[in-house]
Amino acid sequence: GKKKANVYVIMGELSNQAAVQRTKDIDDVIATPDCSFIKIIDKQTSNWNRDEAQNLMTNWLSTGKPFDGVIANNDESAIGAIQAMKAGNIDMKAVVVGGVDATQDALAAMQAGDLDVTVFQDAAGQGAGALDAALKLAKGEKVEHKVYVPFQLVTPANIDKFLKKN
């Protein structure tokens, strides 16, 4: 692997708990020994918006700073960054781009070779988890204060499994 990687982070809406948590998770992972070679060059918000992310990435590209990847709090922002990089003639094979949500557009971007990784939030699994908790409560059974449904990593290697889910 690489000895050093410089990345940009595109955050969601700053007042949104999911954006705050996702950004904290990025920071926490980069702080681990396995990822300590990754340096965040800059972190800005796109408010979950594709156009804002495209403008943000265009501004970053105009600085001329070398970078190796973009980590976005959502797929719309990742796609906006991809559009800016393609417009700026960046070789998409030379950068790693990640998002969250496994939207149809994101899966299409992955199939095109532009998006490297996204995360699938299992809505059916979340619904089933909520229903299961409600049924337990109705029966007077104990339920954990928080019920977690694991996210699933989507890569070109397993994308076929997710194309049918969204």
Can you say where each PLM-predicted feature lies in the sequence?
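Short, solvent-exposed amphipathic alpha-helices that sit
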Residues: 17-37, 52, 56, 80-84, ...
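Amphipathic, non-transmembrane alpha-helical scaffold segments
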Residues: 19, 23, 71-74, 120-127
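Structured segments of extracytoplasmic/periplasmic soluble domains
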Residues: 29-33, 59-63, 84-88, 109, ...
